[in-house]
Amino acid sequence: ERLLPHAQMIITGMQRAKVDVALADNMHKQISLAGTPNIWDAFLQFGITNIVSAMPGVSLVAEVKAQQESTRLLLERTLDLAVLFDPPKVDELVVERICELPIIPVSAFETANSENFFDNQYVYVDWGTTFSLWHAREFNGHAPPYFRTSTGRIALDLILKCGGSAFIPKLLVEEQLKAGDLYHVEDVAHTSRDVFVAYHRDNEQTPLLEKLVTLLTELQIKT
């Protein structure tokens, strides 16, 4: 078991080497991009097609990874770029803040307000460490959340089908708010999360990574 991480690193390296050979034959570059499930739900999914269109000649590998795994892969140089809520504090990595993501209180119940928001089938979504600390100060429910998840999409689907309330990024619920399927509970406090990118400072594809970071930043401007 102790050798398993080392074996996984070797396999990942071999797989990437095979892809690199194929890319070299076709004169393409490859960039691997990873985000946590919540990053994909709340941010990356809305711009991945624009990124692909803006980088012709680049083969993009997009993956869902937990934060700790992304950090490890960056340090092993088997991942080029990670998009994260809680950036790693590692000297070998370049970390940049690219945007701020508004997270708002929404409910399937039109009568939801600050007095009953947390007691009416409240779904807790883990939006990272900073959010957890903020949430601990704001929570005034009389019982624990009736459902917990680390994925915003699961929370959204649940409250749409079964009713309830949750803190969800505004970008993810805009259509439901316009359609009247969800309601913004405006007298409940809202928050936001900073989104960061990280890559190895010695990455040989830094110019391409910088272009990708610029595209991600522009994605926030467009949204």
Question: Whereabouts are the PLM-identified features?
Answer:
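Alpha-helical "hinge/linker" immediately C-terminal to small N-terminal DNA-binding modules
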Residues: 1-23
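Short amphipathic alpha-helical coupling segments at ligand-binding clamshell hinges
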Residues: 2-6, 43, 118-120, 204-218
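Central regulatory/effector-binding core of bacterial HTH transcription factors
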Residues: 28-90
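Acidic, Gly/Pro-rich loop/turn segments at junctions of secondary structure
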Residues: 65-120, 129-134
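Hydrophobic hinge/microswitch elements
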Residues: 66-67, 140-185, 190
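Short beta-strand->loop
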Residues: 94-104, 179-192
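Secondary-structure junction motif
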Residues: 118-146, 152
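A late-sequence structural motif
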Residues: 187-223
